[in-house]
Each structure stands twice: as C-alpha cells, then as structure tokens.
Amino acid sequence: GIGAILKVLATGLPTLISWIKNKRKQ
C-alpha cells in the first residue's frame, strides 16, 4: 500500500541526500 511506499521514502531519502552531498564534495 501507499503506507509502505511512504515508509521507504522516509527511510531512504536521508541516505539519498547524504549520497548526493558526498558526490558534490568530490
């Protein structure tokens, strides 16, 4: 359901943002 999708986004978004920030540093 949509709840599971939102849960995945909530947990995955911080990781994705951190990854993007690390990519910009290099």
Swiss-Prot record:
Annotated protein name in UniProt: Melittin
Main location as per UniProt: secreted
Keyword field contains Secreted: yes
GO cellular component, one term: extracellular region
Site (Important for the flexibility at the center of the helix, flexibility that is important for the stability of the voltage-gated pore): residue numbering on this chain: P14
Domain of life: Eukaryota
Keyword list, A-Z: Amidation, Antimicrobial, Cytolysis, Formylation, Hemolysis, Ion transport, Membrane, Porin, Secreted, Target cell membrane, Target membrane, Toxin, Transmembrane, Transport
Function according to Swiss-Prot or TrEMBL: Main toxin of bee venom with strong hemolytic activity and antimicrobial activity. It has enhancing effects on bee venom phospholipase A2 activity. This amphipathic toxin binds to negatively charged membrane surface and forms pore by inserting into lipid bilayers inducing the leakage of ions and molecules and the enhancement of permeability that ultimately leads to cell lysis. It acts as a voltage-gated pore with higher selectivity for anions over cations. The ion conductance has been shown to be voltage-dependent.
InterPro entries for the chain: Melittin/Api_allergen (IPR002116)
GO molecular function: porin activity; protein kinase inhibitor activity; toxin activity
A Pfam family assignment: Melittin
Tissue expression per record: Expressed by the venom gland.
